[in-house]
Amino acid sequence: RYIPYDQEDVKRQMVAAIGIEDKNTVTRANYYTLDLXIDTVTPDVNRNELKEK
């Protein structure tokens, strides 16, 4: 099912939750993981790339 999230608000919450400063790394796919209640919203590859910056 589709839930019309307030995308900017969702981005802010996810950025705070997973400690990513660049909100642009939050993708549409991540919105669906929120609805599924999955805590891990960022693939390990992206997480490693962010650590290197």
Curated annotation (Swiss-Prot):
<keyword id="KW-0106">Calcium</keyword>
<comment type="function">
    <text>Disintegrin alborhagin-C: 42 kDa fragment of alborhagin autoproteolysed that does not show platelet activation.</text>
</comment>
<keyword id="KW-0964">Secreted</keyword>
<dbReference type="GO" id="GO:0005576">
    <property type="term" value="C:extracellular region"/>
</dbReference>
<keyword id="KW-1217">Cell adhesion impairing toxin</keyword>
<keyword id="KW-1015">Disulfide bond</keyword>
<keyword id="KW-1202">Platelet aggregation activating toxin</keyword>
<dbReference type="GO" id="GO:0006508">
    <property type="term" value="P:proteolysis"/>
</dbReference>
<dbReference type="GO" id="GO:0046872">
    <property type="term" value="F:metal ion binding"/>
</dbReference>
<keyword id="KW-0325">Glycoprotein</keyword>
<keyword id="KW-0378">Hydrolase</keyword>
<dbReference type="GO" id="GO:0008237">
    <property type="term" value="F:metallopeptidase activity"/>
</dbReference>
<keyword id="KW-0862">Zinc</keyword>
<comment type="subunit">
    <text>Monomer.</text>
</comment>
<keyword id="KW-0645">Protease</keyword>
<keyword id="KW-1199">Hemostasis impairing toxin</keyword>
<dbReference type="GO" id="GO:0090729">
    <property type="term" value="F:toxin activity"/>
</dbReference>
<keyword id="KW-1206">Fibrinogenolytic toxin</keyword>
<keyword id="KW-0482">Metalloprotease</keyword>
<keyword id="KW-0479">Metal-binding</keyword>
<protein>
    <recommendedName>
        <fullName>Zinc metalloproteinase-disintegrin-like alborhagin</fullName>
        <ecNumber>3.4.24.-</ecNumber>
    </recommendedName>
</protein>
<comment type="similarity">
    <text>Belongs to the venom metalloproteinase (M12B) family. P-III subfamily. P-IIIb sub-subfamily.</text>
</comment>
<keyword id="KW-0800">Toxin</keyword>
